[in-house]
Design a protein with these regions (language model features):
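Short, ordered loop/turn segments at secondary-structure junctions
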Residues: 44-46, 62, 100-104, 125-126
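Short basic, glycine-rich beta-strand/loop surfaces that mediate nucleic-acid
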Residues: 71-77, 107-126
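ADP-ribose/adenylate-binding Rossmann-like module
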Residues: 72-77, 82-109
């Protein structure tokens, strides 16, 4: 598989189709709803978490026309259904996350950390979801708990640079210096 392009997608208000009704599909539903997608679930049967998930449910087998108007589809059903969904998505040029089937996927939902305006995503290209989860937990522990303050400072400095027309090439070293100063000030305050 070629290297994947990490990409953050704005799904707010856009149609996403989730095919499948089990616990794995429920986890994907949560991710899609949290992203603001207008999710439609297609599955003859659904687990309680999907039933409570707030998305409309089409309680029937998948049909290719379920993908009409979709920006993204998640196939989280049986391997046979997932292949059918992936084929229909490919024909319509819609990205598909085919659970446990990286060969038929054109998109992967990554392990995600969201904290105070900062988002970190981790992927193993669909080959090792367990490792993705472990890496997400490790990265979460490494991120400063007050990263929101770092984000505020970076935003403030960026706006000032835009206003003052600071050249792009000069910004990175200046930002690193600013954030290092913030980090060291906070360490001095927190040490007895």
């Amino acid at each position: 598989m070629p290297d994947l392009l990490p990409l953050f997608v704005n799904l707010a208000g856009r149609r996403a189709v989730l095919v499948g009704g089990g616990p794995v599909a429920a986890g994907k539903l949560t991710q899609l709803v949290d992203a603001g997608a207008e999710v439609v679930v297609v599955s003859p049967d659904v687990c309680p978490d999907i039933a409570r998930g707030g998305a409309p449910i089409e309680r029937r087998p998948f049909r290719a026309d379920d993908l009409d108007g979709a920006w993204l589809v998640v196939a989280a059903a049986t391997p046979e259904v997932n292949r059918e969904v992936a084929k229909a998505a490919e024909e319509r040029r819609i990205f598909v996350n085919a659970v446990d089937d990286p060969a038929n996927a054109t998109a992967f939902l990554s392990g995600v950390i969201r904290r105070d305006g900062v988002t970190v995503a981790i992927s193993t290209n669909g080959d090792a979801p367990g490792l993705t989860s472990l890496l997400r937990e490790a990265m979460d522990a490494l991120l400063p708990h007050d990263i929101g303050r770092w984000m505020e400072e970076a935003r403030r400095v960026r706006e000032a640079w835009k206003r003052d027309h600071v050249p792009m090439g000069a910004r990175k070293p200046l930002l690193l210096e600013t954030l290092n100063d913030l980090y060291h000030r906070e360490r001095e305050v927190s040490q007895p």
